[in-house]
Amino acid sequence: VNRLLGRYMNESLFALTAGIATVEEIDKAVSDYVMPIGPLALRDMNGADIGLAVASYNYNEYGPRFAVPALLGEMVEATVLGQKTGGGFYAYDKETRKRAGVNPALAPLLTKALAKDPTCEVLKEFCNKENLAESLFLSMINEAFLALQERICMPEDLDPALMAGLGMRSGPLELASSMGLPVCLAELERRSTICADKGAFSAAERFRPAPLLKRFVWAGRSSVF
């Protein structure tokens, strides 16, 4: 669960850093799509420091497709950690701890993060506000196929685990089947190629299609189940 969640959480930070959508737009798109809470609100609950530790572990464990978003490091350095410090992606009322809009301290951190990782800009070639939710979950779908390929779990167990653990209304395999496996594969290949052509090789690795997904499509399957 945490491995698949990590891919999607990272992509939300890359999209924010690239300026594809605002904090509130990202969270709303995801909540409207399939999640009970947006990734940035969730990160504020857990803390950017925890997020950075988990992202760093995943990178060391799984490699370049888990590249650590520069924004997390900037937030930790500035002690803009989330609810625990009174501000993260959102600002929080000191009395009630309720959200009080987007945190104004975030803007300069986004500028610094983009300067450290300008390849985030390549996301604008294929990600926009209209396809934002699908774009963020495409990485989770791909990671789900990698997990199946490694025989970490059976297909019939993966979606229930994500739905129980994260409160998703539909799991990644159901999402993939709804989109169509050929569509998922074509979109991942397109994105990986665009990133590589632009010299964003780390980003290209994030979208490299899972071999199992390729095999499913080559076998003529349009859905998982």
Feature annotation, model-predicted:
Residues V1-F225:
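N-terminal glycine-rich phosphate-binding loop for ADP-containing cofactors
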